[in-house]
Amino acid sequence: MGADRRRHAEHVMGTVVSFDVPARAGDPRGDGPLGRAVRWLHWVDATFSPYRDDSDVSRFGRGEVPLEQCVPELAEVLEACAAVSTRSGGYFTTTPGGRFDPSGYVKGWAVERAAGILTAAGPAGHSVNGGGDVQCSGDRMWRIGIADPLHPGRLALVVTGRDFAVATSGVAERREHIIDPYTGQPPAGLASITVVGARLAETDAYATAAFAMGTAARDWVEGLDGYEAFAITGSGTTWQTSGFDRYLD
């Protein structure tokens, strides 16, 4: 890492969010773009965590406050979640196991917005990685390793690209919010699925929905404009959508 770059890892939202940014983005505890992005993530954690009794998500989920008395970003998230649920035929849900929890959308949305704070301030060529789900910005060519869920410590492949988002759902991640809504059980068929798109909020949510679909995911992702996918099945076989090759070396 040269003097013109800065890397920072922030423990927040139950995961580690890693930044790779130009040095001019500033200090993570300062008032510059990096500091503002870090503070945004902690605000999201305090506001949207279903594990904090005093968060807006928890209070709304318990019926203690109406949506109108919550932060406006909650309505924004719920509208986006409803759209993904419709597009996925109900495989994406904010009530896994019957409990209100929009985490399947919030993390990708929060990381994408953090990257947007950096972009708006001018430092081009950065990545924000939230527990393996990544928003990359600028003209720099990025290489993102995809873990092999059946062989811990190994990579299944490396995807490359510019100004794109990569999200993976699977058995290797902490994915307790992924439930097949039609069976009420954890989904079967896939060990992991990686989705590549332009914006992490939707890319991450689509990866969640696709993992819940299991074997039906391939045809579904093929029908999404601007998205590609690579999957590893429970037996170790792999498949990819028709345009995924563009992201491989």
Locate each region found by the language model.
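Mature catalytic core of soluble alpha/beta enzymes
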Residues: 1-249
